[in-house]
């Protein structure tokens, strides 16, 4: 039986994940928070909803900005990693692997997903500004 090559997703374990995004004055803060929580498995959302840190700041032109940040460590971080791997489409997983050299630094994997799609409970890699930033700290096996 032919052995399948290992990929980033199958050969790595996440020990920590940091999710962050911002809500501008024109955005509904509740929807932005929902989008952030939609990134994690449904079974963990209630547990971590109260752990989201909120920071209010001002933009360059004095516009109010709310920054949301959630840090998860341990086994739940790996559960989130696997959930995201399964939730991304095959094309997005391949794109991440093909751009790995610009996404991986010192065992940290950087991914940006569309905030709009996350609100709709779909994950899509997005390189624009309206994103949820995801930073995984990985412990990796060997990738073929």
Describe the residue ranges of each PLM region:
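Short cationic amphipathic helices and targeting signals
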Residues: 17-23, 67-72, 107-111, 132-137
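Long, hydrophobic N-terminal alpha-helical segment
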Residues: 1-47
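Glycine-rich, aromatic-bearing surface loops/beta-hairpins
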Residues: 105-144
């Amino acid at each position: 039986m032919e052995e399948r090559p290992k990929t980033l997703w199958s050969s790595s374990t996440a020990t920590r994940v940091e999710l962050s995004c911002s809500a501008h004055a024109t955005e509904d803060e509740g929807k932005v928070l929902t989008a952030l929580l939609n990134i994690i498995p449904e079974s963990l959302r209630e547990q971590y909803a109260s752990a989201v840190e909120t920071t209010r700041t001002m933009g360059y032109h004095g516009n109010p900005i709310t920054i949301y940040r959630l840090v998860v460590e341990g086994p739940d971080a790996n559960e989130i990693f696997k959930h995201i791997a399964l939730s991304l489409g095959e094309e997005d997983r391949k794109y991440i692997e093909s751009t790995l050299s610009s996404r991986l630094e010192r065992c940290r994997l950087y991914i940006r997903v569309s905030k709009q799609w996350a609100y709709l409970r779909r994950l899509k890699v997005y390189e624009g500004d309206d994103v949820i930033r995801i930073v995984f700290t990985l412990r990796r096996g060997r990738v073929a």
